[in-house]
Amino acid sequence: MSLILYPSLPPTMTPLLSLATALAVKRAVEGTTSARVDLKWPNDVYLSGGKLAGVLVEMAAEIDRVKWVIDSIGINVNNRIVGTDLEGRATSLADELWKEISRRELAVALLMHLEKIYREAQSPAGLISIQRSFRKYDLLQGRPVEVKTPDGVISGTADGIDSEGRLLVRDITGKVQSLFSGEATITGIQTR
């Protein structure tokens, strides 16, 4: 599912839209099924240690304003992951819950939660609320991580997100780096 949005946010705040979208996916999945999911910065939703959903946010912006955003969401609903080469890395609602899930019901719930959280994201108080909510379900918080960035690999402990939705990583010297994008992996444990 992809949506075109016209947020009244400065470009520096758009990483929060990815987090907000992941939060809306969480609320929709948990509101329509018995599944309980976690969020992984910057754009993933996990269930039982496997990736259930992903979010991709693309934008066009000027220096001080966002012109538009394309907010794309992919959820493994009734896909069968067990027995494929994705087993161990990804999962689906059907595989985890052992039953088919109504895509229509999930889509309606997702659109409802997206609308609500998108409206919330238009105000400073709403953005703070989104940050707090994301932090509650942050799979990386307090865990050892490696983050692949265009500039190399950053290792340390995930220390939450900042006010603009960037991942904070504390290295062994105590220095905290704020990362705008990257692929984060929990180290020292194997997921799924």
Question: Could you tell me what each predicted segment is?
Answer:
Residues 8, 77-80, 166:
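Short, acidic Gly/Pro/Ser/Thr-rich loop/turn segments
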Residues 64-95:
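Short, acidic (Asp/Glu-rich) active-site segment that either coordinates a divalent metal cofactor
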Residues 141-192:
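Conserved RNA-binding domains used in RNP assembly and mRNA/RNA metabolism
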Residues 42, 52-54, 131, 142-144, ...:
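Conserved beta-strand residues within beta-sheet cores
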Residues 40-41, 50, 81, 88-91, ...:
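Residue-level signal for pocket-adjacent positions within structured domains
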Residues 1-68, 100-105, 112, 116-124:
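Contiguous, small/hydrophobic- and glycine-enriched helical/loop subdomains that border
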Residues 96-151, 189-192:
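Conserved, helical-rich catalytic subdomain that frames metal- and/or nucleotide-binding sites
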